[in-house]
Amino acid sequence: MRGFNKTTVVTQFILVGFSSLGELQLLLFVIFLLLYLTILVANVTIMAVIRFSWTLHTPMYGFLFILSFSESCYTFVIIPQLLVHLLSDTKTISFMACATQLFFFLGFACTNCLLIAVMGYDRYVAICHPLRYTLIINKRLGLELISLSGATGFFIALVATNLICDMRFCGPNRVNHYFCDMAPVIKLACTDTHVKELALFSLSILVIMVPFLLILISYGFIVNTILKIPSAEGKKAFVTCASHLTVVFVHYGCASIIYLRPKSKSASDKDQLVAVTYTVVTPLLNPLVYSLRNKEVKTALKRVLGMPVATKMS
């Protein structure tokens, strides 16, 4: 990653997100701390269950394992610093720390977007082509899709971070956010950023809209197949599908509000509330929706904890 432009005269940023709330910052600290611990416990539990349950050593649960790992890292990049700033009068962050946070935040965020699209395709094959599932989604393809998601996500993050680091910052240094995100940092640049903003907008479309459309296509076929199943199993699958789509719409919808709009309408106070949705809420919901509601995961969790597991009588 290149350093900031040599003409930069600002040596640090001040993150002013939530500063106007005064004494309510202590309450926010408690709320975010509890949410963060819940996210960590849920995701670490999922990773441990998948790791120590040989029955879950399949591509589908491999995707869930990596998503849980990525979600844990994703929140680790943002929330610990936010917790410190909520209790401190000093809310500064150096250029290098800001660039590092931006890079890893974008890297894990992009990886998550791509992984969820991969998981949508995995569900499409499992439900629409069950007899061919193991032939299509084998372990080799699973590893390739995971590697491709991570490599693509961090490559996009590297390009985006370098584009922002090349901008000139020579005046205001108050970032109207609780972490270093693209829009509020770009707003502080004192040179024309139109061309670079266009490039960043193109990257945002690539990592948000393309996976979102692929997910909609996958789940369109899934819903069509499920509706043809006239049983309780079909209704249960439909409810599961609906819960997945709800989280998808919340995640990609909020991300679109922030990243797919003109600069003139960016970096407002409302953005901080929207950002909480995809930096805290969806990482909290994903383990519940994709894993902890899954029967096989719950059964494996009981076995890991040494709890009795009900078995069907023949």
Curated annotation (Swiss-Prot):
Disulfide bonds join C98-C190. InterPro entries: GPCR_Rhodpsn (IPR000276), GPCR_Rhodpsn_7TM (IPR017452), Olfact_rcpt (IPR000725). One of its GO terms (molecular function) is olfactory receptor activity. One of its GO terms (cellular component) is membrane. Residues 1-26, 77-100, 162-198, 259-271 are extracellular. The chain crosses the membrane at residues 27-47, 56-76, 101-121, 141-161, 199-218, 238-258, 272-292. Residues 48-55, 122-140, 219-237, 293-314 are cytoplasmic. The keyword Protein biosynthesis does not apply. Keywords: Cell membrane, Disulfide bond, G-protein coupled receptor, Glycoprotein, Membrane, Olfaction, Receptor, Sensory transduction, Transducer, Transmembrane, Transmembrane helix. It comes from the Eukaryota. It is found in: Cell membrane. Coiled coil: none annotated. Its main location: membrane. Belongs to the G-protein coupled receptor 1 family. PANTHER family: OLFACTORY RECEPTOR. Odorant receptor. This is Olfactory receptor 10T2. The lineage of its organism: Eukaryota, Metazoa, Chordata, Craniata, Vertebrata.
